[in-house]
Amino acid sequence: MEGWEIRLIDEKEILGFRIDRLAKFLDKNKDVENFNLLARQLVVMQEYYDILVKRIEKAGLLK
């Protein structure tokens, strides 16, 4: 595997972990001052995650 392929997969894994943590945080903290901004951030992070998955699939790296 080339360096960019490893970085792409690593980025997807790290982003997936962060998405999970943010989603759990928002579920438990609906009264947080920046809830709306964090909820929008979560949506964008999920969209970016989907793009990374598509790139990985196109590169034939997803099993």
What does each model-identified segment do?
Residues 1-63:
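Extended, charge-rich alpha-helical interface modules
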